[in-house]
């Protein structure tokens, strides 16, 4: 227990600790008549948004050092209130309390093994679902805290002894999460979890550089592919529901289209020095989906939006027979745009390297829940062959070194 002035000093000292939780935003596809349309934006109150919030919060808790919860003495009228202590939480502590208020049973009922694939959720679930002996008997801590304490605006209405028990349980849960999150076993898991995405990132960037060696002017197409929510839920769509085997066939058909058919629909030379990469992911809200990059000859392809739409139409109408949805990123507006027309010396090439490529190849907690261990989730094309004779002015060393340096710094 600390006094009010000491708590203010502690609170002032934790402003340097990161407490920002990014709002959960997602891309979903829904049926509208006989068409599949996309919507992108904030999506609160879902299982996916709750798990995302818990994950971000636990990442910050693992990195934090200070105590998050305290009791401070206050002057009260004991005839009106049964206590002389008041509950205080730091900013990160408030984020932790929001996690405690979430319905974890809703998550684990639908995804019983979620904690295995997302250890941040697993460590939180284990830490707050411990049994605690209260006055009326033994109960799960998170259940009592959520249903009988945090649901009320006044957190101090309990007797001092009960408030002290809540604070002790919360701080012990935080310490348990910190111990696990900073253990050698967890660090080994994290290193292994990030290894393949890091390799995929380097593979994709090397592919882009190889395409730049063939064409000094690129047209970068970016689009996301998925399925209408109706077909993602077997309870709604029954035998029409999307399965892992169907997704594999759709991905193979997309790859064949990009390798063999796309060039037949574009102007001659558009696919000279072409490259592409497909990344498969699984979301708790939208289930199976893909992030795709296609690299074309920028001197020939001027309308990147329409070419991207051609591929998206093929996915929607032919490959998935109307079950699939597509989002044309080239049509959207971005504050930092690393797609579309890109030349070797463009600032957009840096954005492509530092923003677009890492996003496409980012780690995915949940793909392991639905695919066999030996199956891949990233499919890059082979790099284009570099011709012995190259046209155009000779690139200076400073230009070449600039790209190599930025690549090395991003590792």
What residues fall within each predicted segment?
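Extended repeat-based interaction scaffolds and adjacent low-complexity, acidic/S/T/P-biased segments
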Residues: 1-169
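Catalytic "initiation/cleavage/transfer" segments centered on a nucleophilic residue
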Residues: 2-11, 15, 27-87, 190-214, ...
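N-terminal catalytic cores of peptidoglycan-degrading enzymes
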Residues: 129, 133-135, 145, 159, ...
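Long, contiguous juxta-domain segments that are non-catalytic but functionally important
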Residues: 136-213
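Signature for HUH/AEP ssDNA processing cores
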Residues: 206-278
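A short, flexible beta-alpha/helix-coil linker loop
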Residues: 228-232, 295-300
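A short acidic (Asp/Glu
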Residues: 234, 287-291, 304
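Histidine-centered divalent-metal-coordination microenvironment in nucleic-acid enzymes
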Residues: 275-299
């Amino acid at each position: 227990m600390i006094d009010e002035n000491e708590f203010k000093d502690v609170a002032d000292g934790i402003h340097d600790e990161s407490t920002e939780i990014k709002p959960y935003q997602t891309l979903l596809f829904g049926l509208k008549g006989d068409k599949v349309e996309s919507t992108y934006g904030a999506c609160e109150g879902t299982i996916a948004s709750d798990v995302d919030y818990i994950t971000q919060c636990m990442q910050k808790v693992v990195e934090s050092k200070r105590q998050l919860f305290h009791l401070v003495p206050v002057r009260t009228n004991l005839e009106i209130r049964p206590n002389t202590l008041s509950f205080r939480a730091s900013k990160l502590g408030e984020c932790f309390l929001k996690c405690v208020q979430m319905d974890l049973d809703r998550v684990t009922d639908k995804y019983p093994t979620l904690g295995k694939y997302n250890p941040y959720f697993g460590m939180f679930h284990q830490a707050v679902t411990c049994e605690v002996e209260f006055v009326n008997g033994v109960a799960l801590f998170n259940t009592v805290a959520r249903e009988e304490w945090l649901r009320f605006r006044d957190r101090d209405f309990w007797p001092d002894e009960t408030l002290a028990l809540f604070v002790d349980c919360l701080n012990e849960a935080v310490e348990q999460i910190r111990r696990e999150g900073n253990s050698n076993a967890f660090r080994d898991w994290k290193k292994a979890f990030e290894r393949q995405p890091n390799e995929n990132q380097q593979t994709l960037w090397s592919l882009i550089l190889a395409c730049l060696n063939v064409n000094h002017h690129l047209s970068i197409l970016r689009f996301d592919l998925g399925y209408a929510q109706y077909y993602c839920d077997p309870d709604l769509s029954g035998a029409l529901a999307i399965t892992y085997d169907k997704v594999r066939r759709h991905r193979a058909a997309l790859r064949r289209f990009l390798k063999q058919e796309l060039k037949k629909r574009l102007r001659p030379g558009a696919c000279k020095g072409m490259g592409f990469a497909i990344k498969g992911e699984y979301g708790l809200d939208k289930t199976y989906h893909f992030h795709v990059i296609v690299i074309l000859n920028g001197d020939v392809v001027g309308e990147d939006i329409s070419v991207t739409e051609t591929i998206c139409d093929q996915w929607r109408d032919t490959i998935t027979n109307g079950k699939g949805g597509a989002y044309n990123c080239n049509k959207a507006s971005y504050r930092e745009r690393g797609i579309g027309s890109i030349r070797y010396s463009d600032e957009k090439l840096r954005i492509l390297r530092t923003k677009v490529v890492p996003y496409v190849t980012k780690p995915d907690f949940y793909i392991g829940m639905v695919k066999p261990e030996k199956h891949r989730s990233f499919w890059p094309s082979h790099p284009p062959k570099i011709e012995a004779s190259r046209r155009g002015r000779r690139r200076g060393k400073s230009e070449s070194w600039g790209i190599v340096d930025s690549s090395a710094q991003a590792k």
